A protein has these predicted regions:
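Charged, low-complexity intrinsically disordered terminal segments
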Residues: 2-143, 153-164, 170-474
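Phosphate-binding P-loop/Walker A region and its immediate neighborhood
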Residues: 146
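Short loop/turn segments at beta-alpha junctions that line or gate ligand-sensing/allosteric surfaces
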Residues: 150
Length: 474
């Protein structure tokens, strides 16, 4: 009798789980399976993306390649801010680099600087809820933290709409934008796993209305006021908790130690190159399936190249529309290539599985594929066009970035910045091999490929056969 009762309870729990899973699946599929087309308004707007006209551009830019430099530059911006700091990030963890950023932000707030932080609501549920380090910051009188589209299992029709933006703005004059999240994988040089990525730092001493820094500020204000952005634990009473007091003290002491060691590097300096024009590209900010605005705009930029287009992306997950775009570019541009992680080097099982299955389809577009074999997963999202255009940001060459996430890409017209980007790209390409049409490799750099382990093979196999139907959601 007792055993029968236990079986009934287990069956009831399983039935509830399956009902919830079915509810979530139906809600997600109904909302996100239909992929919107490009509108006439986007087509018209795109025609003016990179026309160089009007007043002389006052913005300067420099690319940030190394993770250690990426942490230092963020601390430098925060430390030198006098009025306002804006931070938007997909993921924010309280590991070593995350605590340094938290400590720097807390120090700025103590100086009277107004701090606003926006974090994606799915990642924050994992990393920030119940975390005294974040409560110590959110309860500060000069700090506001909001979450974009907070995770809610009762609303599956909003589940897949995520905020993938990553940028930091100081005093409305200087900002960092790129593909790096706010934790050890991307910032600093701490032991353990790493992801290699790329940012660009932009400086504008006297911002004009049409400068990119104002484009980014306008974008932030719009998404900050969006109805799906809600405050994160802003009660001042949180500061009275012993666990929060202890966490704040740890942040303050840790940041002061880092500051003392790096004081000379953190002092304000000017080393950015002049630019002709910088333009911000952005996806819609709502949580539903999105018009592929950034994809279309990037495609038009690449189609207008005269000599070369070089893409770097961690993942390639395309539909027919995206493949067709690449086919058009390949027909128009003599030198068209892409570098991505090899199957063995890709830390994302969904990206690895889809690439393994569709590599030949990618080759059929006419694009040259280079596979990165550096050991740590490559996360950079950049495009090099001819000798004067550079595109850097958060956009992956996949359907999630195209149709589901908010995304930002910065288009910079500058031969000096273009050369910086080319040098950075080639450093990674020197650890890559070109895939040939027959499946063999051209290996001019004598690269030793990463071993595809049995464990990784099993992951790829399972994703391909169990989740391949949902490739547009990952």
């Amino acid at each position: 009798m007792k055993r029968h009762k236990i079986c009934k309870i287990i069956f009831a729990i399983l039935a509830v789980f399956l009902c919830v899973a079915f509810y979530e699946l139906i809600g997600i599929c109904i909302t996100y399976k239909k992929q919107p087309a490009v509108s006439d308004a986007t087509i018209k707007e795109t025609q003016n993306i990179m026309s160089v006209a009007g007043r002389e551009n006052t913005e300067r830019a420099v690319i940030i390649e190394k993770n250690s430099q990426a942490l230092l530059e963020r601390v430098r911006l925060i430390q030198n801010a006098k009025d306002e700091i804006i931070l938007s990030t997909f993921a924010f963890k309280s590991d070593e680099s995350g605590k340094l950023i938290l400590g720097a932000l807390h120090d700025a707030a103590d100086r009277g600087v107004h701090v606003r932080i926006l974090v994606d609501g799915m990642e924050s549920w994992i990393d920030m809820e119940g975390n005294p380090y974040f409560y110590g910051l959110s309860s500060h009188e000069n700090v506001e933290i909001k979450l974009y589209n907070k995770a809610n299992p009762l609303k599956p029709w909003k589940t897949m709409g995520r905020m993938h933006d990553k940028y930091l703005i100081a005093d409305g004059k200087i900002y960092i934008l790129g593909g790096r999240n706010t934790y050890n994988y991307f910032l600093g040089d701490f032991p353990g796993h790493k992801n290699f990525d790329r940012d660009v730092l932009v400086v504008c001493d006297e911002p004009q209305k049409d400068n990119s820094v104002n484009q980014l500020l306008d974008y932030f204000e719009t998404i900050w006021e969006q109805e799906d952005c809600r405050y994160f634990h802003n009660s001042k009473k949180l500061a009275d908790r012993q666990s929060v007091k202890k966490a704040v003290l740890e942040l303050q002491e840790g940041y002061q130690q880092y500051f003392e060691v790096n004081k000379e590097k953190i002092c304000d300096k000017d080393y950015a190159d002049e630019t002709e024009k910088i333009t911000l590209l952005s996806n819609p900010i709502h949580t539903q399936a999105k018009e592929p605005v950034v994809w279309y705009q990037l495609g038009e930029l690449m189609k207008n190249a005269k000599e070369r287009v070089k893409i770097h992306t961690p993942y390639i997950i395309c539909n027919d529309m995206m493949y067709n775009t690449w086919e058009e570019i390949a027909q128009k541009v003599p030198d068209f290539s892409i570098m991505t992680n090899s199957v063995a080097n890709n830390g994302n099982p969904f990206g690895a599985a889809d690439y393994a299955k569709n590599r030949n389809r990618i080759l059929e577009t006419g694009i040259d594929i280079w596979e990165y074999e550096g050991g740590y997963s490559y996360h950079g999202k950049s495009i090099l066009i001819d000798d004067d255009l550079s595109v850097i940001g958060s956009f992956n060459m996949d359907m999630r970035s195209t149709y589901l996430d908010t995304e930002l890409m910065l288009v910079i017209r500058s031969k000096e910045v273009n050369k910086q980007l080319e040098d950075g790209m080639m450093e990674y390409e020197s650890v890559s091999r070109q895939v040939l049409d027959d499946g063999t490799y051209y290996d001019p750099y004598h690269v030793k490929p990463i071993e595809l382990t049995e464990k990784h093979k099993r992951k790829v196999f399972l994703v391909q056969h169990l989740l391949g139907w949902a490739r547009d959601l990952f």
